[in-house]
């Protein structure tokens, strides 16, 4: 998937609906942060982005959303030996 195709709310909403994911406000906000560019990131890095953008989203919601996006194929994971899991938007 080319994340650059999903750089606005309407495209992201379509992407979520296409994967049978209810596009809640929090999921859309998280998806906008994730799919704005091709990137690799950890959950902790995403949580920092959420905080930096002053979004009212809990850590639990971030982790649950990452698991949902992974299970539906929107994200791939890269497990490293040092117990970090990186998420990939490609």
Q: What are these regions, as identified by a protein language model?
A:
Residues 28-33:
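Pre-recognition alpha-helix immediately N-terminal to the DNA-recognition helix
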Residues 34-35, 48:
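Long C-terminal interaction/binding lobes of large macromolecular proteins
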Residues 45-51:
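A short acidic, leucine-rich amphipathic alpha-helix
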Residues 71-90:
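Non-DNA-binding regulatory cores of transcription-related proteins
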Residues 23, 36-42:
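Short capping segments at the starts of secondary-structure elements
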Residues 6-20:
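Short, Lys/Arg-enriched N-terminal segment that forms or immediately precedes the first helix
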Residues 62-72:
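Basic amphipathic alpha-helical segments that dock to polyanions
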């Amino acid at each position: 998937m080319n994340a650059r195709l999903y750089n606005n709310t309407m495209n992201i909403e379509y992407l979520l609906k296409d994967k049978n994911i209810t596009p809640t406000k929090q999921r859309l906000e998280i998806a906008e942060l994730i799919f704005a560019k091709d990137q690799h990131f950890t959950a902790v890095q995403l949580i920092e982005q959420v905080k930096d953008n002053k979004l009212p989203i809990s850590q639990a919601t971030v982790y649950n959303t990452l698991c949902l996006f992974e299970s539906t194929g929107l994200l791939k994971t890269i497990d490293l030996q040092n117990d970090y899991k990186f998420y990939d938007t490609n």
